[in-house]
Amino acid sequence: MRVVIQRVNKAQVTIDNEVVGKIKRGFLLLVGLREGDELDQVKKAASKIAKMRIFEDENGKTNLSLKDVNGEILSVSQFTLLANTKKGNRPSFVEAMRPPKSKELWEDFNQELENKDFHVETGEFGADMQVSLENDGPFTIVLDI
């Protein structure tokens, strides 16, 4: 499982000119599931993200968690995070988990975050989406579980 965590001031997902998910300050999560991933990886990733301290405190140190700043989450499924570009010029996606299992685990991941009392907005699994955001920093972390 790979999650790209972007600290944002705001973010939204649009499909066919309709906003389907929108947050203010928080995390934009781009979520890629790998063949072989199970609920254990999903739970571990959600727990790690919930505790991650990447917001600045009053002294300018990255010491505050998402909960500390009353942040929100926008979760977007993105299988292309698992692209293999070692050979040739065309990415291979054989490592990416296929639906319907990937959709189920992504939904489980979002539910795990909601169970930790976060407001979670989402994109639409498998849809062609436009994601817009205002990075804060920028501060981006790649989490591999």
UniProtKB/Swiss-Prot annotation:
Does the record carry Zinc-finger as a key word?
Answer: no
Q: Name one GO cellular component term.
A: cytoplasm
Q: Which keywords describe this protein according to UniProt?
A: Cytoplasm, Hydrolase, RNA-binding, tRNA-binding
Subcellular location field:
Cytoplasm
Q: Where is this motif: Gly-cisPro motif, important for rejection of L-amino acids?
A: 137-138
Q: Name one GO biological process term.
A: D-amino acid catabolic process
Work out whether the entry's keyword set contains Ribosomal protein.
no
User: Which Pfam families does this UniProt record tie to the protein?
Assistant: Tyr_Deacylase
Enzyme class (EC, first level): hydrolase
Instruction: Give the InterPro entries listed for this entry.
Output: Daa-tRNA_deacyls_DTD, DTD-like_sf
Q: What reaction is this protein's catalytic activity?
A: glycyl-tRNA(Ala) + H2O = tRNA(Ala) + glycine + H(+); a D-aminoacyl-tRNA + H2O = a tRNA + a D-alpha-amino acid + H(+)
What molecular function does GO assign, one term?
D-tyrosyl-tRNA(Tyr) deacylase activity
Report the EC number(s), separated by commas if there are several.
Answer: 3.1.1.96
For this protein, the record's SUPFAM superfamilies field holds:
DTD-like
Q: How does the record comment on the protein's domains?
A: A Gly-cisPro motif from one monomer fits into the active site of the other monomer to allow specific chiral rejection of L-amino acids.
User: Do you know which NCBIfam families this protein is assigned to?
Assistant: D-aminoacyl-tRNA deacylase
What job does the chain carry out?
An aminoacyl-tRNA editing enzyme that deacylates mischarged D-aminoacyl-tRNAs. Also deacylates mischarged glycyl-tRNA(Ala), protecting cells against glycine mischarging by AlaRS. Acts via tRNA-based rather than protein-based catalysis; rejects L-amino acids rather than detecting D-amino acids in the active site. By recycling D-aminoacyl-tRNA to D-amino acids and free tRNA molecules, this enzyme counteracts the toxicity associated with the formation of D-aminoacyl-tRNA entities in vivo and helps enforce protein L-homochirality.
Q: Which family does it belong to?
A: Belongs to the DTD family.
This protein's assembly is summarised as:
Homodimer.
Q: What is this protein called?
A: D-aminoacyl-tRNA deacylase
Q: Which organism is it from?
A: Lactobacillus gasseri (strain ATCC 33323 / DSM 20243 / BCRC 14619 / CIP 102991 / JCM 1131 / KCTC 3163 / NCIMB 11718 / NCTC 13722 / AM63)
The organism's lineage is: Bacteria, Bacillati, Bacillota, Bacilli, Lactobacillales
